[in-house]
Design a protein with these regions (language model features):
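An N-cap/entry alpha-helix motif that binds or orients negatively charged groups
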Residues: 2-69
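Conserved, mostly hydrophobic/aromatic
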Residues: 7, 54, 79, 129, ...
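Active-site beta-loop-alpha junctions enriched in small/polar residues
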Residues: 10, 57-59, 92, 119, ...
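N-terminal active-site wall of soluble small-molecule enzyme domains
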Residues: 56, 63-164, 170-175, 201-204
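Catalytic cores of alpha/beta
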Residues: 121-132, 169-179, 216, 220-239
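Glycine-rich phosphate-binding active-site loops on the catalytic face of alpha/beta enzymes
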Residues: 128-148, 185-194, 232-252
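Catalytic-face loop-and-helix region of soluble metabolic enzyme cores
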Residues: 183-239
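C-terminal helical cap(s) of enzyme catalytic domains, especially alpha/beta-barrels
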Residues: 203-207, 230, 245-260
Length: 260
């Protein structure tokens, strides 16, 4: 069983427990009381030039604790001031030590759109993301079927949420396109052995048509990495560990954005 399988299994357990507290129908009623989203995450990434999705992440399965001190609200506000276009918030509690409350409080505190970074395995989690204040959800091809991705994108469309469809290889890129993804992320991290190869983004970029937004995820640590992604025509880059390990996150983001 891969780490992704374990993460997906835990997400199913969490969702099952959440449904005991609030049913899907009750959650849908909560969502109906909110204004419809207007795809602000996609709009932020569509702007000219490379967009930066900056991540609030305390830990990861590959690196363990990344940030002993985790003033998540201040981190998110610093990202916004430093020019982040979007903010990614981990809500997976076991391996990433994330929390739904982190997302809710960050979404309330900043004006840039937020991505709920979690392992979406049930439509419940999409409605939950909207109620928590997210503007986008992550759909990972490795743990979903093409039909599920298609169904979840349709639900996102109804709610005005953006769906970032994450891929790891050529087969998954084609699967995402077949499912109607408008925004595809290529994860440069191999989730079987945690190795990182930013060449993934370069190799798979050519498979993604120009009318589909292209996001490079993981492994970006230098201005040179950013420059190379600009050259291949990436629309956005998602940066987590590099920023989280920086003592001055705003300065690090400014350094990475400086090549633009």
């Amino acid at each position: 069983m891969t780490i992704l399988d374990q993460l997906a299994g835990c997400a199913r357990e969490r969702t099952g427990q959440a449904k005991l507290r609030i049913s899907l129908e009750e959650l849908k009623q909560q969502e109906l009381s909110l204004p419809k989203g207007n795809f602000t995450f996609e709009k932020a990434i569509k702007k000219p030039g490379l967009s930066f999705i900056c991540e609030c992440k305390k830990a990861s399965p590959s690196k363990g604790i990344i940030a002993q001190e985790f003033p998540y609200l201040q981190i998110a506000k610093d990202y916004e001031v430093a020019g982040a276009d979007c903010i990614s918030v981990l809500t997976e509690p076991k391996w990433f030590l994330g929390s739904d409350q982190y997302l809710k409080k960050i979404a309330d505190a900043v004006s840039v759109p937020c991505l709920r970074k979690d392992f979406t395995v049930d439509e419940y989690m999409i409605y939950e993301a909207k109620v928590l204040g997210a503007s986008a959800v992550l759909l990972i091809c490795s743990i979903l079927s093409e039909e599920q991705i298609k169904e979840y994108i349709s639900i996102c469309d109804e709610l005005g949420l953006s769906a970032l469809v994450e891929t790891h290889d050529e087969c998954e890129v084609r699967m995402a396109l077949n499912a109607g993804a408008r925004m595809i992320g290529v994860n440069n991290r191999n989730l079987k052995d945690f190795s990182v190869d930013t060449g993934n983004s370069r190799r798979f970029r050519k498979l993604i048509p120009p009318d589909v937004l292209f996001v490079s995820e993981s492994g970006v640590s230098s201005a040179e990495d950013v420059r190379k992604l600009c050259e291949i025509g990436a629309d956005a880059v998602l940066i987590g560990e590099t920023l989280m390990r920086a003592e001055n996150k705003a300065a690090k983001l400014a350094e990475l954005r400086g090549v633009l």
